[in-house]
Amino acid sequence: MAFADLDSAAQLVEAGYRIALEEGLGAVSARTAAARAGAAASAVNYYFGDRAGFLRRIQALALDEAEGAREAAAAGLARGPRWNSLADRMTLLVAERLQAGRLGFVLLGEFEIEAEVGGDLELQAAAGRGGEAEFAFWRETALVLGAAEGDADGWAGLAVGLLTLLHVEPDAGERLLWLAPAFRRLGARLGGTAIEPVPAGPAPDEVLPEREHANDTARRIVEAAIAGIADRGVSRLTQRDVAARAGVSLAATTYFFRTKADLVEAAMVELHRQVRAEVLASADDAGVATVMAPTGGFSARVRALGALQLAAAREPALQPLAAAVRATRGATSMRMLRRQGVNDADGLDAMVWSTLMGGLIGKLRFAAPADREAAFGAMRDRLQARLFGKV
């Protein structure tokens, strides 16, 4: 339907949705949406009550678009020659979803953070339904393409995890170089075929830039930026807000971090270090599971790191750092797998496992707290046994 054929409320929703896709959820306001729709800003409050009501309608449209994309993908499952493997076909389908709707996934990720930070129960419920629907689609797709019933959660978890890992990457070729090996390795592990180990990769400390903060003031500023990003996202973060949170002057903030981009980069590196250290500090398997499971919602640090990664989708200056963080994927999981007695895993196995677990967490992120830890643990244990054997 053409924009001009929509009623006034629908035009505002469409305008808000387009702004959110192009510039991020933080750019959506009554003023910006009304300006694009050619309406008065007061029309947003008239139709939707407040910004929260407006965002719910935009989220509903984003979820409808995702459902339409899934339906279109389902119509193309029979393509290709008969010798294509399940891994080949899953690679193609995920690549196509990212090519056609990468920013749509970014926007849904922003809505998840908005739902957690704002505590809007309607946003949370809708985000939960969206996550469940995406996982269910990939599970059913894997079954249609020939996966065994007991393996379908693994294929679905990896698909969802890779969509989340790669939706910030604008280069289709770069995305494909992550997708194809991951699905092939999952297929080999599930099929019990020979594994050709990959070369050892660099440690995270070798990939990410060194950030030795000058003094306690600089460290406080970075921690304040992390807190601000967790609360407000990257787009609404200002150096003035960070200075106030840190209890320092704006001049002190700009002395250590000349631009907002410098501050955001420092926050991303520090967040990655903190989250990784928290996982590795877990003394036993139960501790590791507690850190990785979505019990009680994501921590502020994990949420802030997610917000930074999402910001990189639209901010070219952040993309090299986002790629550097992605290059460390699996480094922590390798240590965790070793602790649990998996001694034959290589770096690709660890990346696949970490990404698959991320997909399971995405499915359960907004599930009832009483249910999600048990569900996550059961799926994790069953899949670990399928991929790596009983340990």
Which residue stretches match the model-derived regions?
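N-terminal membrane-targeting/anchoring modules of bacterial envelope and secretion proteins
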Residues: F54, I58-A62, A66-A69, L77
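Short, structured motif recognition centered on aromatic/hydrophobic residues
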Residues: A66, V106-E116, A156, D285, ...
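Amphipathic alpha-helical packing segments from all-alpha helical-bundle domains
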Residues: R102-G109, G119-V144, S299-G306, P316-G341, ...
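Helix-turn-helix
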Residues: Q11, L21-R57, R220, A224, ...
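Hydrophobic/aromatic-rich alpha-helical bundle segments in the mid-to-C-terminal region
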Residues: Q124-G128, L143-P199, Q319, A323, ...
